[in-house]
Regions:
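Transmembrane signal-anchor helices characteristic of membrane glycosylation enzymes that use polyprenol
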Residues: 25-28, 119-123, 245-257
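Membrane-embedded alpha-helical segments of multi-pass membrane proteins
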Residues: 28-46, 83-95, 163-171, 217-225, ...
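Membrane-interface helix caps and helix-loop-helix hairpins in membrane proteins
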Residues: 74-82, 209-210, 259
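Alpha-helical transmembrane segments of multi-pass inner-membrane proteins
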Residues: 108-141, 147-148, 155-230, 241, ...
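Long extracytoplasmic/lumenal interhelical loops at the membrane interface
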Residues: 262-276, 280, 286-321, 340
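Hydrophobic alpha-helical transmembrane segments
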Residues: 321-333
Length: 346
């Protein structure tokens, strides 16, 4: 109760709602959606969403985009896509409200909350992993990552790959806090916080290994390197590049340590087939796509591999939204990129 009273004394009602929304991300996704929807409709009633759109340049394109992809999904009877379209509208709108109420203290508290709850997710994932081992009559502790998705830990994040994506964010946030604490030679002044952040980072990296998601590792290394570049830590950037190169060399020499190495050839073949199916559908629906989750909606038509998306950040947007859809939302993103550029120059 003291924690709740403390938060209420430091933040207004909307800011407290944001902390609840962040915490809800660590619950099963259907509970997360319900909590976010309750908060969203509360803000609509309070006029917060309307003010967010009025005060944010090019934000009207969010409504145009969401309406377009919703109608496209309905036209093609892509019902999961129709639901996700409404989710896009809700989440985009919530970010506009956040911009109105953002403060350095709120931002820092949100990051601390995510870091703390990532420990909860890690503990849950390890317990989940122990139960997975018991399904194979493996007593004690074995560091084995299975190929089948149902035997890879996900910590309530829908599936192992989604949990791996979240871990990338957790580690990036920890890295940001590390950079912040070591800025201007402040290492010794924050030694306790740095040690805690380091331990939490290692815990999350261990759980990332348990997810068996191989592509998360180079993506994470690249993301941290970009953070160093933006922070002008060129020596550290060179260091992380060297570590990354050493890691590549190690796995080339010792491929048996790559998670799920036994099916890597099959995995590459599956990815290739997924992309081929996606490209086939793009050829016939290149203007509007078929809405969010298009791959999940169409894979059976092409005898494709069953999965939720096309596993490619370049193919999937075109597959789902088409050229017209991407052009509709482009002004909003361009405006935000300009704003970020101006911020970086100051």
């Amino acid at each position: 109760m003291d924690i709740i009273k403390n938060l209420k004394s430091r933040f207004d009602s909307v800011q407290c709602d944001f902390l609840i929304a962040i915490a809800a991300i660590f619950l099963p996704f259907y509970i997360t959606v319900v909590i976010h929807a309750i908060i969203f409709f509360k803000w609509i009633k309070q006029g917060e969403v309307k003010k967010g759109y009025e005060e944010t340049k090019r934000s009207k394109y969010i409504i145009f985009f969401s309406a377009l992809i919703f109608l496209t999904s309905v036209f093609y009877q892509n019902w999961p896509g129709a639901g996700v379209s409404l989710g896009y509208l809700m989440l985009y709108s919530m970010t506009l409200v956040y911009r109105r109420h953002a403060s350095e203290e709120l931002f820092d508290t949100m990051l601390n909350l995510v870091i703390g709850l990532s420990v909860f997710a890690s503990v849950w994932a390890i317990i989940e992993y122990i139960f997975i081992l018991r399904q194979f009559d493996l007593e004690g502790w074995y560091l084995v990552v299975f190929n089948a998705p149902q035997y890879r830990t996900n910590a309530m994040f829908f599936n192992a790959n989604y949990y791996a994506m979240m871990i990338e964010f957790f580690v990036a946030i920890c890295f940001y806090k590390f950079l912040k604490h070591t800025h201007n030679h402040g290492f010794m002044n924050h030694i306790k916080e740095i040690v805690i952040i380091g331990l939490i980072t290692l815990l999350n990296l261990f759980c990332l290994y348990l997810t068996g998601c191989r592509t998360a590792w180079p993506a994470l290394a690249g993301g941290l390197a970009i953070m160093l570049l933006f922070n002008r830590n060129y020596k550290s950037f060179g260091g992380i590049c060297a570590v990354g190169a050493a890691g590549v060399g190690f796995f080339i020499a010792k491929p048996q340590y790559i998670p799920r190495m036994s099916n890597i050839v099959k995995y590459l073949g599956v990815r290739k087939h997924i992309w081929e199916v996606a490209i086939q559908n793009i050829k016939t629906h290149f203007l509007f796509g078929e809405g969010p989750m298009t791959y999940w909606h169409i894979y059976a038509q092409y005898n494709g591999h069953p999965t939720q998306h096309s596993h490619n950040i370049f193919i999937d947007p075109v597959l789902c939204f088409g050229i017209i859809g991407l052009l509709v939302i482009a002004p909003f993103f361009i405006e935000n990129i300009k704003r970020l550029y101006r911020l970086l120059r100051t």
